């Protein structure tokens, strides 16, 4: 078995970024937090997730996140699967977050993109089929 354990995001402000992910994942919790040093720079860090996966947030970021419409090397986006995209959108809307980019709706999936407060593009996808071949078809 192989699965993703965590994503480590460097942000400027942990509480602001955490609020977005708390709205998206109300069942997740702060697993641990503390202070440390990252290559000579002090930082606060926090792990937010469940017993199996989490987001690591650190507040020692400098500069701006990658321009998503550009062609720079770096993270374009990451995605989470949900079994109810409409409920996800409603939670984020109620918390004051707007859709950054509408996704596709086809026979086998629907998705949507948000920008978190740190500027990372986050995709949420709901699959409408249990068949992996259908899920992975290109539109």
Predicted regions and their residues:
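N-terminal beta-strand motif that seeds the catalytic metal site of vicinal oxygen chelate
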Residues: 1-18, 75-80, 130-139
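A short, acidic/glycine-rich surface segment
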Residues: 30-32, 40, 62-67, 132-133
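Vicinal oxygen chelate
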Residues: 31-34, 89-139
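Short, charged/polar surface micro-motifs in flexible loops or helix N-caps
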Residues: 50-54, 61-63, 85
């Amino acid at each position: 078995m192989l699965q993703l354990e965590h994503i480590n995001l460097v942000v400027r402000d942990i509480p602001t970024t955490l609020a977005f992910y708390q709205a998206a994942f109300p069942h997740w919790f702060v697993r641990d937090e503390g202070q440390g040093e990252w290559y000579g720079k002090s930082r606060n860090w926090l792990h937010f997730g469940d017993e199996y996966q989490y987001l690591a947030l650190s507040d020692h970021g400098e500069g701006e996140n990658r321009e998503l419409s550009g062609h720079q090397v770096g993270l374009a986006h990451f995605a989470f699967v949900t079994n109810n995209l409409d409920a996800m959108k409603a939670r984020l809307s109620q918390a004051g977050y707007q859709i950054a980019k509408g996704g596709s709706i086809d026979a086998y999936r629907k998705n949507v993109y948000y920008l978190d407060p740190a500027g990372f593009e986050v995709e949420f996808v709901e699959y409408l089929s249990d068949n992996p071949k259908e899920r992975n078809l290109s539109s």
